[in-house]
Amino acid sequence: MLQILNNANDKIQYKLNDFSDLTPSFKIKSGFFTIHRINYEKLEENEEEKPRQISAFDIETNGREIFFGVYDGSEYKYVIIRKPEDVKNALDLLTEETYFYGDYDLPVSLANYVLLGKHSKFAKKITGENYFTTKNLRIKRYKNFYKILYNGRSINSINLLQFYSESLYEAYSRYYTKLQEMGFQVFDEQTMKEWKEDKEKRANFDKLDFNDPKTIQEIARYNKLDVIATYQLALLKNSLFGIKVKSTLPRTAITYIISQVQSEFVKGLRSYTEIELTLKRLYKGGLFDSNELGKFKKVYKYDVNSMYPFMMSWLPELELVETQKGFEVNEEPLLKGTQFNEDAKYVYIYKITLKQDRKYVASKANGMLLRMMYNRGSFFDFELADEKHELIPDIKIVGQYYTMKFKITKHRIFKDVIYNLYNKRLQLKKEKNPLEKVYKLILNSSYGKFGERIGFNAKFQNVIYASMITALGRTFIQNVDPNAISYLTDSVISKAPIKSELVGDQLGQLKQEGVGEAIVIGNGQYILNDPQEKMIKLRGFNVDESIAEKIIEYVGNYLAKGKIVRVQIPTKIMIRNLQQYKILAEKDSNVLMGMLSNQIKIFTPLNTKQRYTYNVHWFGSMFRDEQEHKEYRKTWEKYIETIEPIDLNSILS
């Protein structure tokens, strides 16, 4: 049943500043790797983009029914979804471009649709939330974006959280003044206060009766505030970013960045089996690893300022010169240790097997990024270099090898646009301007678009650039301190201060975040007792900081004695999709879709990225190869199950 709660008395007035007279058009050819030039053409004065009708929606659920509220700028309406047919009524309210806030609303609605209708034959398809279809409904999921085809209509449903990266209330508060300046009818002070209080009280929804008119009226009151806030922020984002906003933030960022670059990017690539095999194995993630674990009297923690944007600023224009079944050392690599070389003439990509006697190069194996004695895969030349050598003496090339040789035809093609964005962000940060966050989001979201859908002809996909950015990051951060305690993607925890010339507030320099005693019990799991600010991180567990501190101290004290303990940690898990639901429902029949579920997670220190042995500290060593790692992981998992977990309450008491 469709119910209209009320109509807005006054249509919200808004205006969008036109920051650019450029409209992108893409030339897409068949091919495997090429980033194609993006041509920009000015709009004629009498040309206008076709306006799109925009709406926003938000849901509330008790795990059985769904309250689905929608606002289109003039009217707020809602539907209560009790059976599959009601989903159609909800979709009828949506416009061709609609926004939701967070990774909750649409996935939960779709999963509940499957459960309500018992669409068992479609459940497998929607489990991964990538593709879902029934007779009259088709949904394709991308990251932060859904394409819905329903009843002859095409609806783009966009997760607005990606453009703000904080809670809805925080984002609305941050840009409250900006919304006023844009002419929006913003919430008054009393409404803001009530909205905040409502959000803090939202709990135990599974107890709510969606058949009670009074309950529905109360739900509608704050659901309406959510959807109006989402709607206003959706319209505001174009003006905030000052550039043409696309359906996702990474696409928005990379479209803008590429539009500022005059380059052909990568030239000379052709479809060839050996090339494809080499480049498919090239992409790896950041270095997230620990060489030592335990208690330390004094450590230094540093973060690289915007590490990936900085590495992106070093990307060159490349032209493939030759491929060969041989190995040739590049005597002038782009990076040696932490020193970049703007006079480098070539970039080599190798498909090789190498033997290393110390931890340098990382390879993907068994679903992890491992530094093993024998590494097989694809590598850049600079990954094999350090401050003094083009090929580290501890690295030997063994087995078959293949080399792709690229000529650098233009250096640092993204430098100007990256530095302009970064410097603008620094200036706004000094001014305490909330728009500072916008520039941070653009910088941090841009690099990943290069690596999307490797192996497909995506508009911005380029495996070489995506791989080079992360490889430069891994190589740089490890060479900051080859003997560091931990590497945390763009951070390093060391026993001694790093070189002073690497420290500063400029792009790519390292900022000292803390100094003091530390307990490190796993990757991203530590306490650092800096006199100015105690840092407590327990990656993978959403618990209060005070509880995390006690867990780390307890486990760390045992590790310091050479003993391993495990801890049972009660945690609340939000059931957002069918995959989670299926797993948890097997253990607990009371699990409800879209609701918090009380679960027990077990914390185990150490990890299987390295083989740890105890000698005052726990020291990590490399595995010989991926087979040895696979066998070790099986043995470790069997062993760790013999250690009975300790109840968290016994630690807290």
Swiss-Prot record:
BP term (GO), one: viral DNA genome replication
Single GO term (MF): nucleotide binding
Main EC class the enzyme belongs to: transferase
GTP-binding recorded as keyword: no
InterPro entries in UniProt: DNA-dir_DNA_pol_B, DNA-dir_DNA_pol_B_mt/vir, DNA/RNA_pol_sf, DNA_pol_palm_dom_sf, RNaseH-like_sf
EC number(s) stated in the UniProt entry for this protein: 2.7.7.7
Catalytic activity: DNA(n) + a 2'-deoxyribonucleoside 5'-triphosphate = DNA(n+1) + diphosphate
Keywords: DNA replication, DNA-binding, DNA-directed DNA polymerase, Nucleotidyltransferase, Transferase, Viral DNA replication
Its biological purpose: Replicates viral genomic DNA.
Family according to the record: Belongs to the DNA polymerase type-B family.
Record-given protein name: DNA polymerase
Organism: Acidianus bottle-shaped virus (isolate Italy/Pozzuoli)
